[in-house]
């Protein structure tokens, strides 16, 4: 194997694994606190999401309450209007979280975010909520993305 090719592969891998966490804002987390948000692959911010590809979203958070269930609700906010952004699995207990959720324990909510080919190529703010038994937000975060061809 050519050493230049190996070097490019290693640098690409390092860029992929050493990407900065996604910058986000809290949008009303009632029952929890988000520590970090990661999207893979995402080498720059806002993340460029390519149509027809899937991305892994990992939200590290802690809960302030006990909850037997958790449900994700995702919207793309366009001109201040939330538009539903369907995800394949909205059950947080099937997305890296071992339920029941208990207070003060760290959790990693991990799921796939598919970007459909029919989505328009635009900049959008993603609003991601994970709700508890009482439909209160364990977390609510917003972060910008750009959907590209």
From Swiss-Prot:
Bridged cysteine pairs (disulfide): 27-140, 42-47, 93-99
Keyword Endoplasmic reticulum appears in the UniProt entry: yes
Record's signal peptide: 1-19
InterPro entries named among the record's database cross-references: Ig_E-set, ML_dom, ML_Npc2-like, NPC2-like
Keywords, comma-separated and alphabetical: Cholesterol metabolism, Disulfide bond, Endoplasmic reticulum, Glycoprotein, Lipid metabolism, Lipid transport, Lysosome, Secreted, Signal, Steroid metabolism, Sterol metabolism, Transport
A GO molecular-function annotation: cholesterol binding
Keyword flag Endoplasmic reticulum: yes
SMART domains membership: ML (SM00737)
Entry note about domains: Binds cholesterol in a hydrophobic pocket; there are no hydrogen bonds between the sterol and the protein.
Cited function: Intracellular cholesterol transporter which acts in concert with NPC1 and plays an important role in the egress of cholesterol from the lysosomal compartment. Unesterified cholesterol that has been released from LDLs in the lumen of the late endosomes/lysosomes is transferred by NPC2 to the cholesterol-binding pocket in the N-terminal domain of NPC1. May bind and mobilize cholesterol that is associated with membranes. NPC2 binds cholesterol with a 1:1 stoichiometry. Can bind a variety of sterols, including lathosterol, desmosterol and the plant sterols stigmasterol and beta-sitosterol.
Protein's recorded name: NPC intracellular cholesterol transporter 2
Organism: Danio rerio (Zebrafish)
Gene from which the chain derives: npc2
């Amino acid at each position: 194997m050519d050493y230049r090719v190996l070097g490019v592969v290693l640098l690409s891998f390092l860029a992929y694994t050493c990407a900065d966490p996604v910058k986000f804002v809290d949008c009303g987390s009632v029952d929890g606190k988000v520590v970090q948000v990661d999207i893979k692959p995402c080498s720059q911010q806002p993340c460029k999401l390519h149509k027809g590809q899937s991305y892994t979203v990992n939200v590290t958070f802690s809960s302030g309450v006990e909850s037997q269930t958790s449900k994700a609700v995702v919207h793309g906010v366009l001109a201040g209007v939330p538009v539903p952004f369907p995800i394949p699995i909205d059950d947080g207990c099937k997305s890296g979280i071992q339920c029941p959720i208990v207070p003060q324990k760290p959790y990693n909510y991990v799921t796939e975010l598919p970007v459909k080919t029919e989505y328009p190529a635009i900049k959008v703010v993603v609003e991601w909520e994970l709700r508890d038994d009482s439909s209160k937000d364990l977390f609510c975060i917003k972060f910008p993305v750009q959907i590209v061809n």
